[in-house]
Amino acid sequence: IKKNTSRNMAIETGLNKLISNWGHIQTPYPGKYINHILKDIGENKLFSLIIDEKYGGNKISTTQLSNVLTKLSSHNPALGVMVMVPNSLGPGELLVKYGNESQKKQYLSKLSDGSLVPCFGLTGPNNGSDALGEIDTGVIFKNKNNELSIRVKINKRYITLAPVADLIGLAINVMDPDNLLPSDVKPGVTVALLERGHPN
């Protein structure tokens, strides 16, 4: 990792601290130290490597991110996965690319510092990590407040960080049989954000 900026130096320092503290743990996830490890990752801004500084992030280039993950994984592959997933797919990346300003302000700073741990619900028993495959479906309906909502029936498997996640990005194929969506909005594959404790 190049040490030509204070940001990169901070990342290097945080990375070395994480390796020193947890690199020797054989099963960091979902072992008994998981909450301590997640706190350490968040405090050292290692969840924020794809998030702009404007939202509390520590964004670096793809090459630099690859270097971070290579170094971490060479010490402990499980730790590498715990840092890789939030920095590569799921709520953080999707909010950065597609979220509106309100959503970015609500979630990105909390994802950056580890206040929210994300996961991405895509893989199911009949599909791998393929957003265009046989993924779960949702149906547009109007709730009791006459607001457009999505009723989803899900069956997910093998979701990294799911047992400890606070925010899930749920990939679903949305259908609109009653034509409730505005004419300029098309049904199809989308991602819903659900916080832990979301009512069924």
Q: What is each of the regions a protein language model found here?
A:
Residues 1-86, 99-106, 110, 115, ...:
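Amphipathic, small/basic residue-rich leader segments at the start of a protein or domain
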Residues 41, 116, 132-134, 146, ...:
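A generic structural signal for well-ordered coil/turn residues at beta-strand boundaries
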Residues 49-51, 119-122, 151-154, 194:
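General beta-strand structural signal in soluble alpha/beta enzymes
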Residues 60-63, 93-97, 129-135, 161-165, ...:
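Short acidic, glycine/serine/threonine-rich loops at helix termini
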Residues 76-93, 112-128, 155-168, 190:
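FAD-binding core of FAD-dependent oxidoreductases
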Residues 106-110, 120-141, 157, 177-184:
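Beta-sandwich/jelly-roll carbohydrate-recognition scaffolds of carbohydrate-active enzymes
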Residues 147-200:
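A short core secondary-structure module
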